[in-house]
Amino acid sequence: MSYGLYIGKNLTSNGHAWLAGYGDEPSSHWLEIIPKKKHKTGKKIIVGVTKNADMPGKLIKIPQATKTHKHIRVSYSYYLGVPAPITNGGLNEYGVAVRDIWSKSRKELIEMTPKNQTGPNYSDLARIVLERAKSARDAVTIVSNLIKKYGESTYGGNSHIFADSNEAWVM
């Protein structure tokens, strides 16, 4: 299980919004500081899960943005067959924060998940938001568009909190 907490700027004594989280993943964690980058037009990134994941799927290639934002992220090495390194949260240069939240899905929802799923996994979505979003609302639009176009690879129960200094969204 993991947890996330957002406190809006109108509820703090100093006017700052807060996003916090905890996860009990059984692997090593580390912080990475990723500089802003320019990428060649047409560059692709690999997203998804492998056939060896607890809920199998396949890796696909999707377009990388031509510019990605500077960000700090929390990465870890393993969870249920999702390819490492795995990102479960962070903060970018525009003040967009991401926190991955996991809770176990109901059995019937897991059974409904396609056995050869495609699309970005929860980690891919967190990383892409850190690279591309300029607001929490922008993060929701980016993730919605990616899932609509490519699908989503799940291992049964992930959501995200996308936050900035003005608002937060749970998706």
Provide a role label for each language-model segment:
Residues 120-136, 142:
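N-terminal leader/propeptide and maturation segments of large enzyme subunits in energy/redox metabolism
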Residues 2-121, 142-155, 159-171:
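A contiguous strand-loop segment
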